[in-house]
Amino acid sequence: MAVHKEVSFVAYLLIVLGMFLYVDALGCTKECGNLGFGICPRSEGSPTNPICINCCSGYKGCNYYSAFGRFICEGESDPKNPKACPLNCDTNIAYSRCPRSEGKSLIYPTGCTTCCTGYKGCYYFGTNGKFVCEGESDEPKPYMSTA
């Protein structure tokens, strides 16, 4: 019976230790990153406040619509590796809808953001402008007042 209790205790200890290691692996380190800026594709514009963009320079994953709600195109430019696109505005495009719609599109300066603490769906670049990583953390939801 004593052997059974020892095995149970060792198994329990291994499980608890494993949980601590797993939780610790999910945590981000506290040191600051050396990132230059971040780009987070966001929904922009509206039928009454149009944006100046074209399909080539629009972000992949974002859809672009006319003032009447007609789908125009999906963006073609990858923030990690932007295309060389003309600078003209497509006057048919009024607004975009992107998977992430809250917060800033351009994060500069990045402060103490690291790849671990950066938001999923945001792309982070070094001070030399080269792509470093995509963020790994879930973006907090904006606080909604119930009053």
Curated annotation (Swiss-Prot):
Signal peptide annotation: 1-25
Reactive bond for trypsin (site feature) positions: K30, E31
Pfam families named among the record's database cross-references: Prot_inhib_II
Site annotation Reactive bond for chymotrypsin: residues: L87, N88
Record keywords: Disulfide bond, Protease inhibitor, Repeat, Serine protease inhibitor, Signal
SUPFAM superfamilies: Plant proteinase inhibitors
Superkingdom of source: Eukaryota
GO MF term (any one): serine-type endopeptidase inhibitor activity
Residue stretches of each Sequence repeat: 25-81, 82-141
Positions of disulphide bridges: C28-C116, C32-C112, C40-C122, C52-C89, C55-C73, C56-C85, C62-C98, C115-C133
Family matches, as InterPro entries: Prot_inh_I20, Protease_inhibitor_I20
Gene3D superfamilies from the UniProt entry: 3.30.60.30
Family indicated by similarity: Belongs to the protease inhibitor I20 (potato type II proteinase inhibitor) family.
Name of the protein described by the UniProt record: Proteinase inhibitor type-2
Source species: Solanum tuberosum (Potato)
